[in-house]
Every structure is written in structure tokens, then in C-alpha cells.
Amino acid sequence: MSKDDVIEMQGTVLESLPNAMFEVELESGHKIIAHISGKLRMNFIRILPGDKVTVELSPYDLTRGRITWRAK
């Protein structure tokens, strides 16, 4: 899967789950499970409930995503 295939959306973190997973509510109202991308994990970026984030979704599974950016 290339970078062109991903769907980027904005959302809000609802809660933190085990294993660095998060429940995120997208702007469209859907709730998904998302994990942190490698660069956020490497740089120790903390993600807390209530944070605005950018999520990448795969077109194959729209219920799971990857958090790629945390808004300031």
C-alpha cells in the first residue's frame, strides 16, 4: 500500500487504551481505534484524552488507524 492510498482525517482522542492504542472520534462522528506512528513514539510525544490529532486510515479497514500528528 502506497502513501497515496491512505485517508487522512482529523479527530479527538476520547480515551487511552492498553498497548499505546487510543479511541479516537473523527470529525464525521465515527469512532475508531488508532495507534501511534513510529516518529511520534521515537520522539516521546505524549497523547492525552482531549487532544486533537490527525489520523491516517487504510481504505481496507476503516475502523483502525495510525495517529500521525498531535495538534498543539
Curated annotation (Swiss-Prot):
Its main location: cytoplasm. Residues 1-72 form the S1-like domain. One of its GO terms (molecular function) is translation initiation factor activity. Disulfide bonds: none annotated. CDD domains: S1_IF1. It comes from the Bacteria. It is found in: Cytoplasm. PROSITE patterns: S1_IF1_TYPE. The keyword Hydrolase does not apply. Keywords: Cytoplasm, Initiation factor, Protein biosynthesis, RNA-binding, rRNA-binding. One of its GO terms (cellular component) is cytosol. HAMAP family: IF_1. Belongs to the IF-1 family. One of the essential components for the initiation of protein synthesis. Stabilizes the binding of IF-2 and IF-3 on the 30S subunit to which N-formylmethionyl-tRNA(fMet) subsequently binds. Helps modulate mRNA selection, yielding the 30S pre-initiation complex (PIC). Upon addition of the 50S ribosomal subunit IF-1, IF-2 and IF-3 are released leaving the mature 70S translation initiation complex. Component of the 30S ribosomal translation pre-initiation complex which assembles on the 30S ribosome in the order IF-2 and IF-3, IF-1 and N-formylmethionyl-tRNA(fMet); mRNA recruitment can occur at any time during PIC assembly. This is Translation initiation factor IF-1. It comes from Clostridium botulinum (strain Hall / ATCC 3502 / NCTC 13319 / Type A). The lineage of its organism: Bacteria, Bacillati, Bacillota, Clostridia, Eubacteriales. The gene is infA.
